């Protein structure tokens, strides 16, 4: 069964546009150094979908990516404790959804994005996924 996630990146480090340029091969999502986020990465399966969130600058959901390779050891982690996944670009939102708008939308204000602001990889329930897709003016993927 497909699962839904949100992953964060600082756009000056890795943006949705850079993700798009990575093409069908996608890009490795690495560098995550939080144990709860790591645990979420290990639960990701091929075909799962993730909202792509620009953190720090913008603070908004800007698109959707798909997991194309499930968790493997993160080569940037010298200790071997953390994992990475590989994701490919699916769609960029015409209307990015700001954190402020998410906080003000009662139906999705419960999300970890609001409650655990430092968490960089988090699950998204299907009902919230549908609402956010509608808000971003994309068809439900």
What is each PLM-predicted segment?
Residues 1-44, 139-141:
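Compositionally biased, charged N-terminal/linker segments
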Residues 12-14, 94, 131:
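Short, acidic Gly/Pro/Ser/Thr-rich loop/turn segments
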Residues 14-17, 59-61, 75:
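Short acidic/glycine-rich loop or secondary-structure boundary segments that cap or lie
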Residues 18, 96-102, 133-135:
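Short, charged, solvent-exposed linker or helix-capping segments at domain edges/interfaces
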Residues 47-48:
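Loop/turn positions that initiate beta-strands
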Residues 53-59:
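Short, charged beta-turn/beta-strand-edge "cap" motif at the junction between a beta-strand
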Residues 62-122:
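Aromatic- and Lys/Arg-enriched surface recognition patch
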Residues 124-141:
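Charged phosphate-binding loop/patch that engages nucleotide di/tri-phosphates or the phosphate backbone
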């Amino acid at each position: 069964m497909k699962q839904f996630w949100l992953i964060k990146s600082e756009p000056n480090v890795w943006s949705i546009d850079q993700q798009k340029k990575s093409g069908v091969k996608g890009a490795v999502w690495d560098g995550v150094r939080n144990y709860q986020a790591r645990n979420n990465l290990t639960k990701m399966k091929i075909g799962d979908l993730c909202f792509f969130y620009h953190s720090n600058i913008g603070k908004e959901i800007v698109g959707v990516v798909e997991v194309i390779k499930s968790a493997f050891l993160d080569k940037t982690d010298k200790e071997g404790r953390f994992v990475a996944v590989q994701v490919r670009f699916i769609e960029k939102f015409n209307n990015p959804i700001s954190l402020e708008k998410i906080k003000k939308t009662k139906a999705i204000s419960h999300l970890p994005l609001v409650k655990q602001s430092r968490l960089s990889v988090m699950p998204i329930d299907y009902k919230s996924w549908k609402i956010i897709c509608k808000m971003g003016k994309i068809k439900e993927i």
